[in-house]
Amino acid sequence: MFLSAALRARAAGLAAHWGKHIRNLHKTAVQNGAGGALFVHRDTPENNPETPFDFTPENYKRIEAIVKNYPEGHKAAAVLPVLDLAQRQNGWLPISAMNKVAEILQVPPMRVYEVATFYTMYNRKPVGKYHIQVCTTTPCMLRNSDSILEAIQKKLGIKVGETTPDKLFTLIEVECLGACVNAPMVQINDNYYEDLTPKDIEEIIDELKAGKIPKPGPRSGRFSCEPAGGLTSLTEPPKGPGFGVQAGL
């Protein structure tokens, strides 16, 4: 029933070792939430219903094309892509942009708020030009994503959830981005950078500072997600339809 002193000491050591990996529930979602709140909006000088927002003429044409992808009378189905379009135009989603989306799609504003607060990909507060999203979920953590996160913080002089003074970079932690076989990895805007070392991420940041877009994908020399030692299957083009089928069939 009682732990020995040695076992208690061992348990304490493990707790200290793993403590830095323990994160609060929904931490990444909270980081993306308005004012640090997961589902709550509070008016601020830069984010309120009177914040100027309207789509450009070009984006209104894109919205028309998007809506045509859905059956007549089902404009509401276009909430996700139209919100994404608003974010790409503005860089983030003030509540006035959500209201504009609701107006265009003829849905109650609450329907748009529900979507914008559910998906962490929607930024409900301003972010830098380059949004660095570091995966720290288990596979990346086991591949030392902590070293990538620490290298970014040291390089940029900011902590998780902060933006550089020049508004170039915002740093956040995110949950799994679906590229576990290329861990550790980060997403910067729409691009994945994989198989990273601290030196790799520093070089990527330097290129971005210089106005260049680094080549996305693995930094280890792999083409995609094949084994590091090379392919072990599918080493030649497929034979095509009918290969191996009995002649009489």
From Swiss-Prot:
Q: Which GO terms describe its molecular function?
A: 2 iron, 2 sulfur cluster binding; metal ion binding; NADH dehydrogenase (ubiquinone) activity
Enumerate the Pfam families for this protein. 2Fe-2S_thioredx (PF01257)
Q: Which residues carry this modification: N6-acetyllysine?
A: 61
Q: Where in the cell is it found?
A: Mitochondrion inner membrane
- Entry note: cofactor: Binds 1 [2Fe-2S] cluster.
Do the record's keywords include Aminoacyl-tRNA synthetase?
A: no
* Membrane-topology annotation of the record: Peripheral membrane protein
Q: Which cofactor does it need?
A: [2Fe-2S] cluster
Chain positions found as Phosphotyrosine? 193
InterPro entries per the UniProt record, alphabetical: NuoE-like, NuoE_dom, NuoE_N, Thioredoxin-like_sf
Sorted alphabetically, the Gene Ontology cellular component annotations on this record are:
mitochondrial inner membrane; mitochondrion; respiratory chain complex I
Q: What's in the keyword line of the UniProt record?
A: 2Fe-2S, Acetylation, Electron transport, Iron, Iron-sulfur, Membrane, Metal-binding, Mitochondrion, Mitochondrion inner membrane, NAD, Oxidoreductase, Phosphoprotein, Respiratory chain, Transit peptide, Translocase, Transport, Ubiquinone
Q: Name one GO biological process term.
A: mitochondrial electron transport, NADH to ubiquinone
What stretch of residues directs this protein to its organelle as a transit peptide? Answer: 1-32
Which reactions appear under catalytic activity for this entry? a ubiquinone + NADH + 5 H(+)(in) = a ubiquinol + NAD(+) + 4 H(+)(out)
Question: What EC number(s) does the entry state?
Answer: 7.1.1.2
The entry describes its oligomerization and partners as:
Core subunit of respiratory chain NADH dehydrogenase (Complex I) which is composed of 45 different subunits. This is a component of the flavoprotein-sulfur (FP) fragment of the enzyme.
What does the function comment of this entry state? Core subunit of the mitochondrial membrane respiratory chain NADH dehydrogenase (Complex I) which catalyzes electron transfer from NADH through the respiratory chain, using ubiquinone as an electron acceptor. Parts of the peripheral arm of the enzyme, where the electrons from NADH are accepted by flavin mononucleotide (FMN) and then passed along a chain of iron-sulfur clusters by electron tunnelling to the final acceptor ubiquinone. Contains one iron-sulfur cluster.
| Protein family (similarity comment) | Belongs to the complex I 24 kDa subunit family.
Protein name (database record): NADH dehydrogenase [ubiquinone] flavoprotein 2, mitochondrial
* UniProt organism field: Bos taurus
Question: Could you tell me the gene encoding this protein?
Answer: NDUFV2
